[in-house]
Every structure is written in structure tokens, then in C-alpha cells.
């Protein structure tokens, strides 16, 4: 039952932002096909290599993407580390303390940057990695449309609505219905 619940909530976390966005914004698939044609392939290869080393990586990346999307949308702010400015990052939030996978995304980003410097956003790399992780875990493969004009918010967001990693399915169901 836990596995089914986890898969359902993972699918909702990944697909809901895309469905909601599609209703209000212009989406463009294949955004990087001319700017960095190898971007998605680089992400695929890097995620595949990470999965060979650790079969738990797909779940970690899907959860990381979920936490990034849940509060205010897909912006990769969950990957930011706290700096000396004393403005805490999302990684310092209690809800995000146990997240695994940022190191994998950092490595993927470095590989993409080596091929196409300053071109592919961290948010898109995380989205591609979550999609590829979903597929590697036995889920579907889907296209990632890109939306320009995302708003970026730095610092710890309100996690009063975010599900805890130890929440029961019934609790998560209530949170998703809010």
C-alpha cells in the first residue's frame, strides 16, 4: 500500500505542475533542440549512470523534484545552498533535510554546462532528471514543456502545507486536496 501511495503522489507531483501550467501559460516542447540539442541526452546518460551505482536514485530525484514543485512551482530553488548572507536556503528547511539527490543534479548540471555553457536552466535539468528517473523506475516517459516567465523566490518557503516524509497516505491525501 505504501508503494502504491508513493507512486500516486509522485505522479501527481510531477504531472500536476505541467497540467496547471498548460492551462495558463504557453508551453513549448523541444525548447533546447536548437540551443543545446544534446541536453536531454546528457541528462539521460547521467541519470542512467547514477541509477547503475544506486538503484534508489530514481526515488530520491522524484522526491527532490516534488519538493521543488510543491509550494510555488518548478524553479530548482531546492538545490540552492545557504551562503554567508544568513538567508537560509530551502535545503535548510525541516521538510527538506532528508532530501537526497542534489549531488546527482549538480553532476548532471556540470556535464550539461560543459557542452552548452549558460544555456540550460537548473529547473529544466531537474525536470528532465525526474522524468528520466520516473521512466527508470518503471513509469512513463513524457515530454517536458518549457515555460518562460517563472517567478523565483529565494529562502525558506512556508512548508506548513508540505507533506512530511513520514506522513500517512490519508494525511497526504488531505494536503493534496487543499
Regions found by a protein language model. Name each.
Residues 2-5, 13-178:
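Folded extracytoplasmic luminal domains of secretory or organellar precursors
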Amino acid at each position: 500500500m505504501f508503494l502504491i501511495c508513493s507512486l500516486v503522489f509522485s505522479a501527481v507531483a510531477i504531472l500536476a505542475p505541467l497540467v496547471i501550467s498548460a492551462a495558463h501559460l504557453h508551453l513549448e516542447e523541444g525548447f533546447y533542440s536548437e540551443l543545446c540539442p544534446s541536453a536531454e541526452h546528457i541528462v539521460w546518460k547521467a541519470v542512467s549512470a547514477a541509477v547503475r551505482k544506486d538503484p534508489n536514485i530514481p526515488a530520491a530525484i522524484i522526491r527532490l523534484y516534488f519538493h521543488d514543485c510543491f509550494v510555488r512551482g518548478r524553479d530548482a530553488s531546492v538545490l540552492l545552498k545557504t551562503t554567508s548572507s544568513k538567508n537560509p536556503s530551502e535545503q535548510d528547511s525541516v521538510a527538506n533535510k532528508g532530501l537526497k539527490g542534489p549531488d546527482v543534479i549538480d553532476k548532471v548540471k556540470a556535464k550539461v554546462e560543459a557542452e552548452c555553457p549558460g544555456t540550460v536552466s537548473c529547473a529544466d535539468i531537474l525536470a528532465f532528471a525526474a522524468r528520466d528517473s520516473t521512466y527508470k523506475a518503471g513509469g512513463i516517459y513524457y515530454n517536458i514543456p518549457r515555460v518562460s516567465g517563472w517567478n523565483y523566490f529565494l529562502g525558506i518557503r512556508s512548508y506548513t502545507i508540505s507533506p512530511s516524509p513520514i506522513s500517512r497516505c490519508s494525511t497526504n491525501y488531505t494536503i493534496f486536496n487543499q
